[in-house]
Amino acid sequence: NKKGKNKMAKTIENKKVAAYLGDAKLELSTPLIVGGKEIKEIVIKEPKVKDLKAVSHIHNDLDRTVTLIANKSGFTIDEIEDFPTHIYMKLQGLVEPFLR
């Protein structure tokens, strides 16, 4: 039954769209200087399962979170560690749901 298959595919497709959380963007009120460049926003790409597996061996919560933020934002771990705490806390809030 072709109609049944199309309906099923549409239902699955709708679920995929609903399940996609997307990339997260943090806009900075005061630009951050990183590597000599002025940063006005930080984008964290939505982690995939392989990204979560890549940090699952890290037992320290802070190190695991910093590593995931670095992996998904394009900044190095050292750069993330130099971020002001208030910016790190906002970034942590964006990735924390994936680390539960």
Summary of predicted features, one role per range:
Residues 1-7:
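Short, Lys/Arg-enriched N-terminal segments with co-localized hydrophobic residues
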Residues 9-100:
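Short, surface-exposed, charged amphipathic helix/loop patches that serve as local interaction elements
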